């Protein structure tokens, strides 16, 4: 499999996005209804409120999947390998628009064929430092012909891999990957999982 411990690629300039202290996330009740907003910086702690996010898996023109290694400065799960990118929609922002915006900011990618594949994915996970993620997190796939230009504050490293190779690596060493990727790999057919995407999916990880 592609070496997932390779030397980090040089980061390139990326579009400016508001600092997390100014970024608002959408708060949700247990039924998934929007109940308000809060600064992103205030909702990721030891008692994280349920909020709306998204994950995206990006394929290139050869069918390879982009995996990224989270920057060491990230609050939660620094330095672990994960799916192509994640993010949070702004209040009233359509999710596909948020996916494209985040791809441009974090990786310098222009996306096409943005499609939901796990629209009801939900999880709660706690990292080694006690930081909790608690999200309803629709999962998307997309395609790109762009060359990644990773933002250094977001991405330490990246690699293009065959989906089957990633599936094998996640199952062999789940501790090396983000918990949401480990859970998604159990559900996504291209990673060897299986799920009816119309069914609400939930998982708790500590």
From Swiss-Prot:
Catalyzes the 1,3-allylic rearrangement of the homoallylic substrate isopentenyl (IPP) to its highly electrophilic allylic isomer, dimethylallyl diphosphate (DMAPP). GO terms for molecular function: isopentenyl-diphosphate delta-isomerase activity; metal ion binding. The gene is idi. GO terms for cellular component: cytoplasm. Its cofactor is Mg(2+); Mn(2+). It is an enzyme of class 5 (isomerase). Keywords: Cytoplasm, Isomerase, Isoprene biosynthesis, Magnesium, Manganese, Metal-binding. This is Isopentenyl-diphosphate Delta-isomerase. InterPro entries: Idi_bact, IsopentenylPP_isomerase_typ1, NUDIX_hydrolase-like_dom_sf, NUDIX_hydrolase_dom. Pathway: Isoprenoid biosynthesis; dimethylallyl diphosphate biosynthesis; dimethylallyl diphosphate from isopentenyl diphosphate: step 1/1. NCBIfam families: IPP_isom_1, PRK03759.1. Binds 1 Mg(2+) ion per subunit. The magnesium ion binds only when substrate is bound. Residues 49-183 form the Nudix hydrolase domain. It catalyses: isopentenyl diphosphate = dimethylallyl diphosphate.
